[in-house]
Design a protein with these regions (language model features):
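Phenylalanine-focused residue identity feature
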Residues: 7-10, 39, 48, 70, ...
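Canonical Radical SAM [4Fe-4S] cluster-binding loop centered on the CxxxCxxC motif
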Residues: 18-76
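Conserved SAM/AdoMet-binding glycine-rich loop
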Residues: 65-150
Length: 150
C-alpha cells in the first residue's frame, strides 16, 4: 500500500479558462488523464493524479481563513505570511473577493473523473464554507461524464 502523499499547501493549476477569470480555482486533479489532444501541449510529459480529498478540503479552508483575514481583520492581513501556501491562498482569496465570491472552477482538466462521493464531499464543503457561491464549473470529457453511475 502506497503511503499517502503529504499536504504541501494550497495549490492552483497552470490553466484558467478566460471565462473563469472571476472564479476561485480549486485544484481537484493534477494534469490531464487523456493528454492526447494535438492542440494542447500544456500537460505533455506530466503524470495525471487525483489530489486527496483531504488536501482539497484543506485548500478550501485556507481560502476561507484568508477571506476572513481580509474582510474581518484587514490590519492583520497586512502582516507577513507564514509560508508560500498561505500566501497563495490569500492571493486567490483577494482576487476572488474583488470578483464577488460567486463562482468556483474545479481544476485541472477532467475533474469529474474523481469518484462522485468525493466530488459531493468537496462541493458540500465549498457550500458550507462559502454560501455565496452560485456556480461551480469544471472541464470534463464527455466520455468521463457518460461513465458516471447514478
Amino acid at each position: 500500500m502506497a503511503a499517502e502523499e503529504p499536504y504541501r499547501g494550497f495549490e492552483q493549476g497552470p490553466i484558467r479558462p478566460p471565462s473563469e477569470r472571476d472564479s476561485l480555482l480549486v485544484r481537484v486533479t493534477r494534469n490531464c488523464p487523456w493528454n492526447r489532444c494535438t492542440f494542447c501541449g500544456l500537460y505533455k510529459g506530466e503524470r495525471f493524479s487525483r489530489r486527496p480529498v483531504a488536501h482539497v478540503l484543506r485548500d478550501i479552508d485556507a481560502v476561507r481563513r484568508a477571506v476572513d483575514r481580509l474582510t474581518v481583520a484587514p490590519a492583520v492581513a497586512a502582516s507577513p505570511m507564514a509560508d508560500e501556501g498561505e500566501w497563495l491562498a490569500e492571493h486567490a482569496a483577494r482576487t476572488w473577493l474583488q470578483a464577488g465570491c460567486r463562482s468556483v472552477f474545479l481544476q485541472d482538466s477532467n475533474s469529474l473523473i474523481i469518484p462522485p462521493g468525493d466530488l459531493e464531499t468537496i462541493l458540500l464543503h465549498l457550500r458550507a464554507s462559502f454560501p455565496s457561491v452560485a456556480r461551480v464549473t469544471s472541464y470534463a470529457r464527455s466520455q468521463t461524464v457518460a461513465r458516471i453511475a447514478d
